Curated annotation (Swiss-Prot):
Enzyme Commission numbers on file: 6.3.2.4
Annotated gene: ddl
Gene Ontology molecular function terms on file: ATP binding; D-alanine-D-alanine ligase activity; metal ion binding
InterPro entries hit by this protein: ATP-grasp, ATP_grasp_subdomain_1, D-Ala_lig_Van_CS, D_ala_D_ala, Dala_Dala_lig_C, Dala_Dala_lig_N, PreATP-grasp_dom_sf
Cofactor binding comment, as recorded: Binds 2 magnesium or manganese ions per subunit.
Residue ranges of domain ATP-grasp in the record: 106-305
Protein's recorded name: D-alanine--D-alanine ligase
EC category: ligase
HAMAP family: Dala_Dala_lig (MF_00047)
Lineage: Bacteria, Pseudomonadati, Pseudomonadota, Gammaproteobacteria, Pasteurellales
Disulfide bonds: none
Binding site for Mg(2+) 1: D259, E272
Length: 308
């Protein structure tokens, strides 16, 4: 019989070595404080400084994983935790690895008949054959160019002119071997949290600049968020069903946040999955959860309770 959660020693994994280290430290400290305030025996563990493989030997019973980006959100730490036999929050190995790869996630959604943006894929090896003319004929202008793997909108460019396409792809290739060139989705940007099997209210993101980049996500205070997002109840219901399908198709569990854009005709298009959403004062998951009655501390405890 497992010990009650309050009697378990809980490691809060935070920091790490990805480009999103700082955000993870902020999220981790917020989660740590929330757990301690609720009477949990929680300890901060930064994999950059502490060997995670030793956690079980050190008497830990469970992990709250709030690492962001590569290493923490891509299946590697999940595999290690499976190996040493510690239950952890969030998605398992397969869903974490898959959703870190935006291209393969979209291909899977598309195969299940779920709506995504039209795209072309360029790799380092295929770059020399890139024909901007053909791409623009197929996808139009403007275009969105982004690395397939890096999180937090690093390496993104909006391409307005055909002559700028190659340099945008080269820029994105600095961050990843594989780059996506996508049709520009001109409608609203939404993000939808899922907690266990419950889809929470959508949030509308209105950045002051061209799109929601790293600075807007974590630094700027001029990005506006609306929750509820202003969709009609009928549209919100349609979005809820779409997001739940998207979540299930890629095998998410525990909690995740799914980004959705509207195209020029107002149709939903799935963008990507965040399997370890931010949990800072700026973060969107807690904002949405608050509208259905979760305090930040209750939300953190619920995510912990969903750990497997």
């Amino acid at each position: 019989m497992a010990k009650p959660l309050k009697q378990q020693k809980i490691a809060v994994l935070l920091g790490g070595t990805s480009a999103e280290r700082e955000v993870s430290l902020n999220s981790g400290n917020a989660v740590l404080t929330a757990l301690r305030n609720q009477g949990f025996d929680a300890h901060p563990i930064d994999p950059k400084e502490y060997p995670v493989a030793m956690l079980k030997e050190q008497g830990f019973d469970r992990v709250f994983n709030i690492l962001h980006g590569r290493g923490g959100e891509d299946g590697t730490i999940q595999g290690l935790l499976e190996q040493i036999g510690l239950p952890y929050t969030g998605c398992g190995v397969m869903a974490s690895a898959l959703t870190m790869d935006k291209m393969r996630t979209k291909m899977l959604w598309k195969a299940f008949g779920l709506p995504v943006a039209d795209m072309e894929v360029v790799t380092r090896t295929s770059f020399s054959q890139l024909n901007p003319q053909v791409v623009v004929e197929k996808l139009g202008l403007p275009l969105m160019v982004k690395p397939s793997l890096e999180g937090s909108s690093v390496g993104l460019t909006k391409v307005n002119a055909i002559d700028d396409l190659k340099s945008a792809v080269e820029f994105a290739l600095q961050y990843d071997e594989t780059v996506l060139i996508e049709e520009w989705l001109s409608g609203d940007e939404l993000t939808v949290p899922v907690l266990g099997n419950e889809v929470l209210p959508s949030i509308k993101i209105v950045p002051q600049g061209e799109f929601y980049d790293y600075e807007a996500k974590y630094i700027a205070d001029n990005t506006q968020y609306f929750c509820p997002s202003g969709l009609t109840e009928e549209r919100e219901q349609e979005l809820r069903q779409l997001v739940k399908q998207a979540y299930d198709v890629v095998g998410c569990r525990g909690w995740s946040r799914i980004d959705v854009m509207l195209d020029g005709e107002g149709k939903f298009r799935l963008v990507e999955v965040n399997t370890n959403p931010g949990m800072t004062s700026h973060s969107l998951f807690p904002k949405s959860a608050a509208t259905v009655g979760y305090s930040f501390e209750q939300l953190v405890v619920k995510i912990l309770e969903l750990s497997l």
